[in-house]
Amino acid sequence: MQICGSSVASVAAGTSFQVLGPVCWQQLDLKMAVRVLWGGLSLLRVLWCLLPQTGYVHPDEFFQSPEVMAEDILGVQAARPWEFYPSSSCRSVLFPLLISGSTFWLLRLWEELGPWPGLVSGYALLVGPRLLLTALSFALDGAVYHLAPPMGADRWNALALLSGSYVTLVFYTRTFSNTIEGLLFTWLLVLVSSHVTWGPTRKEPAPGPRWRSWLLGGIVAAGFFNRPTFLAFAVVPLYLWGTRGATNPGLKSLTREALVLLPGAALTAAVFVATDSWYFSSPATSRNLVLTPVNFLHYNLNPQNLARHGTHARLTHLAVNGFLLFGVLHAQALQAAWQRLQVGLQASAQMGLLRALGARSLLSSPRSYLLLLYFMPLALLSAFSHQEARFLIPLLVPLVLLCSPQTQPVPWKGTVVLFNALGALLFGCLHQGGLVPGLEYLEQVVHAPVLPSTPTHYTLLFTHTYMPPRHLLHLPGLGAPVEVVDMGGTEDWALCQTLKSFTRQPACQVAGGPWLCRLFVVTPGTTRRAVEKCSFPFKNETLLFPHLTLEDPPALSSLLSGAWRDHLSLHIVELGEET
């Protein structure tokens, strides 16, 4: 037999193994290096979660799961978003309960029964849910390991691209509903691919176990209740599942397979509806069924509601977000799609348009399948005017499979490494990077022991930052002498007026009165001057580096000056009395 071009002599002939050639050793060394690289990046994924990451990507990471569950499970002070009020009920609560809720329940149980009290802290509340998502993210690695050979992809190159992507390191280790959507989409691909054979003549597969169809239907229903946009990702694999082995794929075969999926989907939907109805009901209201996906669609299909969250051009996903998340891999996918389109146009000129665009030609090869898995959801999501980059993170798995073919090396390796290093630095460290450490610092301040004779009231005012997740302060829900005020991107005059109103509270005006009032302002270095204009003396100031706010970016001249560190820091200023 042949190994890397060097023959192995026959033992029966009495010959020994020939020395492997230099090309073979290079290939073996390269494969081993890729495996070591994947192992190192996997370790980095876990360690960086524990460190923890300081970057604050988007408020939805906190306010669609841990902020709500911390209030429900631990009874701490939190800012509940409108989606989780019974009057709105736009988000299903089952996945937040399973991810953040289970983590917080274990923390509460440990604090009540464990030998070391005081385990619950801002750090534990931050890292606990993230660590669970990080563990679940390795299901992506297992899926790529399983999917790569039948998809014509190099297994270890695909795993290296997956583990080295900053999307995996940053987004798949956080409590976004998009993260759950990506995990469910990947498991859907595994179930479908294991029941499909590729080739010029696809034979109808033998009937699989009934649990597989039930599980497939359950995943589709769970994905829909998590985010109704999951259907955009599921349409291609479900079509492949419904037409596998069919001589004439059409409505009949799709309907037959849809009925097979129905029991699992119905059972899963019943669990979600029961959980949501229980969660959003109260003794004062009638116990009606709560259908959170219906409420979600009713809200988001209204253009005026979407406009409140920002409107984007229809090509934002294709022209901007794809490059922002995946860099050169998105460019490779565009190139592959263009080449496939050219082949299709040539075929249509020779055979006719209808035959060339038939289902058999669209899904005739794994590469065509991967292209559809990537571009079909992207096109469907582009129909909506609100387009954020994180909506595309479920596309990572089909993309890395598409960009790591067995017959070719991964191109642009240096560019891929540099792009993901910069992405991890920006979104994992710099972007709003001082806010989470700032909350940890303020947690220590407000929980510091004070003299019983002089109780202290704290006012924590945040301006020009993302919404502060209040559960990280670990404040009791009732009676906490701490007031958290989120001013958002307020004007300078409104900031000064608000500060004056806090310092003129009766308890703060009485010299030697019953309360000692401490006022803290949290602001980026680029907007610190607005606080100075309010004529309050600075009692002390703490800088947390790095912190980059793209809404108020530092000027280039300030970055080139000696004060660049101040402009790239979050400032926590304790104010004295107004002068």
From Swiss-Prot:
Q: Which locations, inside or outside the cell, does it occupy?
A: Endoplasmic reticulum membrane
InterPro entries to which the protein is assigned, alphabetical: GPI_mannosylTrfase
Q: Which cysteines are joined by disulfide bonds?
A: none
What are its E.C. numbers?
Answer: 2.4.1.-
Q: Which pathway is recorded for this entry?
A: Glycolipid biosynthesis; glycosylphosphatidylinositol-anchor biosynthesis
Per its record, what are the GO molecular function terms?
alpha-1,2-mannosyltransferase activity; mannosyltransferase activity
Q: How does it sit in the membrane?
A: Multi-pass membrane protein
Q: Does the keyword Calcium apply?
A: no
Q: What is its main location?
A: endoplasmic reticulum
| TM regions (residue ranges) | 131-151, 156-173, 180-200, 216-236, 258-278, 369-389, 391-411, 416-436
- What's a single GO BP term from this record? GPI anchor biosynthetic process
Reading the lineage from the top rank, the first entry is Eukaryota
Identify the keywords attached in UniProt to this record, alphabetized: Endoplasmic reticulum, Glycosyltransferase, GPI-anchor biosynthesis, Membrane, Transferase, Transmembrane, Transmembrane helix
Q: Which GO terms describe its cellular component?
A: endoplasmic reticulum; endoplasmic reticulum membrane
On whether Glycosyltransferase is a keyword of this UniProt record, the answer is yes
Per UniProt, what is one Pfam family of this protein?
A: Glyco_transf_22
| Tissue expression | Widely expressed at low level, with highest level in brain and colon.
Role, per record: Alpha-1,2-mannosyltransferase that catalyzes the transfer of the fourth mannose, via an alpha-1,2 bond, from a dolichol-phosphate-mannose (Dol-P-Man) to an alpha-D-Man-(1->2)-alpha-D-Man-(1->6)-2-PEtn-alpha-D-Man-(1->4)-alpha-D-GlcN-(1->6)-(1-radyl,2-acyl-sn-glycero-3-phospho)-2-acyl-inositol (also termed H6) intermediate and participates in the twelfth step of the glycosylphosphatidylinositol-anchor biosynthesis. The presence of a fourth mannose in GPI is facultative, suggesting that it only exists in some tissues.
Q: Which family does it belong to?
A: Belongs to the glycosyltransferase 22 family. PIGZ subfamily.
Q: What is this protein called?
A: GPI alpha-1,2-mannosyltransferase 4
Native source organism of the sequence = Homo sapiens
Q: Which gene encodes it?
A: PIGZ
